[in-house]
Curated annotation (Swiss-Prot):
Function, in words: Key component of the proton channel; it plays a direct role in the translocation of protons across the membrane.
One of the record's GO molecular function terms: proton-transporting ATP synthase activity, rotational mechanism
Localization (cell): Cell inner membrane
Name listed for the protein in its UniProt record: ATP synthase subunit a
Single Gene Ontology BP annotation: proton motive force-driven plasma membrane ATP synthesis
Lineage: Bacteria, Pseudomonadati, Pseudomonadota, Betaproteobacteria, Burkholderiales
CDD domains with a match to the protein in the record: ATP-synt_Fo_a_6
GO cellular component term, pick one: proton-transporting ATP synthase complex
Organism of derivation: Albidiferax ferrireducens (strain ATCC BAA-621 / DSM 15236 / T118) (Rhodoferax ferrireducens)
Subunit structure: F-type ATPases have 2 components, CF(1) - the catalytic core - and CF(0) - the membrane proton channel. CF(1) has five subunits: alpha(3), beta(3), gamma(1), delta(1), epsilon(1). CF(0) has three main subunits: a(1), b(2) and c(9-12). The alpha and beta chains form an alternating ring which encloses part of the gamma chain. CF(1) is attached to CF(0) by a central stalk formed by the gamma and epsilon chains, while a peripheral stalk is formed by the delta and b chains.
Gene3D superfamilies: ATP synthase, F0 complex, subunit A
Classification via InterPro entries: Alt_ATP_synth_F0_Asu (IPR017692), ATP_syn_F0_a_bact/chloroplast (IPR045082), ATP_synth_F0_asu (IPR000568), ATP_synth_F0_asu_AS (IPR023011), F0_ATP_A_sf (IPR035908)
Sections of the chain in a coiled coil: none
Bilayer topology annotation: Multi-pass membrane protein
Amino acid sequence: MRLSPDEIIFWQHGFLKLNATIVFTWGLMLVLAVGSKLITRKLSTGLKRSRWQNLLEIVVTAIEKQIEEVGLRDPKKYLGFLGTLFLFVATASLCTVIPGYEPPTGSLSTTAALAFCVFVAVPFFGIKDQGLGGYLKSYVEPTVIMLPFNIISEISRTLALAVRLFGNMMSGAMIIGILLTITPFIFPIVMTALGLLTGMVQAYIFSILAAVYIAAATRGRKPKPEPGEKH
């Protein structure tokens, strides 16, 4: 049983390798890019809309609602980044029904790259919202003594994001593989459905955690209503 798609080598020349992680990652990006282009090329504002547009609107609305529930004031500002994270991880899991496909999220290099994107996005949105001085000030609050601890916190939660997604995806694939080996004719459909569900849950958790980190950096939470204030 393979523990990682990194072990599947399609081409190698010296220290250069083309493994399944790279191939399927770029394949997923191509599918998402081409798919989004095809779906959005004929958008309509009228009553008559295509099934693909209806599906797209449902997905976008659901993602916006989740971003808003985290507390970010303007979900549209973060929709592109957070929506892409969710769709990439979710699509990587949904494609496991294709024979021969290996999800790139089963590789630590992929999950680390996704976590690094979040690591870069947090200060990007924080500086954009508060300015450089306002964002850096958050590292020395409530006192300058907290500076090293806040820096360690930023790095550790990035590592936690990468390891959490990798561990959950790999362990889920291993458990399903073991069960299918033991009972190959009884549980294949059930185990496949369970794997898809696990992947969707991990995509949701990863994107929500990214939204929470961005909300903390931007302080872009909705203000709480004062007592007696009308909603």
